[in-house]
């Protein structure tokens, strides 16, 4: 799905588009769900038939044949349950994988400016726990709603064929309950969105605390970091309490409905029996069908929570996916080829978004092979100028050219492939030394890696390590001295 689709489509349209590649698994899940619902609906009807026809006539052979069929039906039901459990969750995981890949790819494509304000912990939350909520929503919600709908409607149809007056009373009660459920959904959804927001905040503080753990210990500031974390932790606790309060109201309403529905069946059914409009067998059948409502209604209660969590996470997902890169290739952008290395900086000015000018009317011309050092006080714009050359940001005024080509007229990919950048904050991936060196040229041979290590004057140090170039450097190079 491209950026245009995320801009033009509604959230649920975006959500349903992820079903398309896995529609066969989804269809299998729905067919098995339908089969389970039909088996559950058949049991009370078969029980009624046995009580009416077989038991009074002492039809032993037919009775046991029917019981054998029921037994086989429940074996099939178990098979269908296995299929729903295994393949249904497989379907959900595949959708989650697609969501996560699209989100990670989109994050990779965002401009430098986005990460000036973005928090790593929030992004981690959206890539992990919030995508899990969307997965549970994708897998369970359609299945549970489908089973519940088929079971409730099917049971009502059968009950109308038995005694329409009692069935009508039940049919009137159910929409009232569903209306209350729908209203509860909105309060739970709003509470769930707040939980997601606070969860992202606590992940941000957690990530920051872990990343700065050595610094905190060096300055004996553990208590300060704990206070910061406690504040976010308590806010998350309060948001969870609000969510559980909304969920508690919903569950209380649901339990009241189930109890009152059983009471209505006994009360109205008893009155109909006393007026010779209903018999005991049909009342038992009605009670059995009402009991079949219990599982679907309980599923609906869980589904409402899944919908609340899933739609809240989906909303945050779509918001992030709709965030566009501030820097894009020009329609007529060309690839830099056969780069010599001449850099022309002409009357460049630059200001970060909503900030004062960092650079004003800077001009500089660097010949191929020439070495230039920018020297000055902190905050003078040295790093900013170096980040404008590979076009991590766009100049506010003036221009920067490489071999006579304005960097805004070159593709960003070709710029980044031809310009090497060593960041102020050195970052090493949790991989081998060889793979970290190869990162600047993914197809580099081992000979090229060794040559690069010798040029950086680290070859001898590497060879003194037990595993040489295969030595794992750890997270951010923590295993190196």
Give residue spans per PLM region.
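Hydrophobic alpha-helical transmembrane segments of ABC transporter permease domains
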Residues: 31, 35, 39-43, 68, ...
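Transmembrane helix-loop-helix hairpins at lipid-water interfaces of multipass membrane proteins
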Residues: 20, 26-80, 160-165, 276-280
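An intracellular "coupling" helix at the cytosolic face of ABC transporter transmembrane type-1 domains
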Residues: 16, 21-24, 112-113, 129-138, ...
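Short intracellular "coupling" helices and adjacent cytoplasmic loop segments at the cytosolic face
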Residues: 1-6, 93, 101-131, 204-228, ...
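Alpha-helical transmembrane segments of multi-pass membrane proteins
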Residues: 73-92, 143-150, 169-195, 209, ...
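Membrane-integrated ABC transporters
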Residues: 1-40, 55-66, 84-92, 105, ...
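Helix-loop-helix
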Residues: 56-65, 158-172, 246-315, 320-321
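ABC-type nucleotide-binding domain
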Residues: 329-330, 336-481
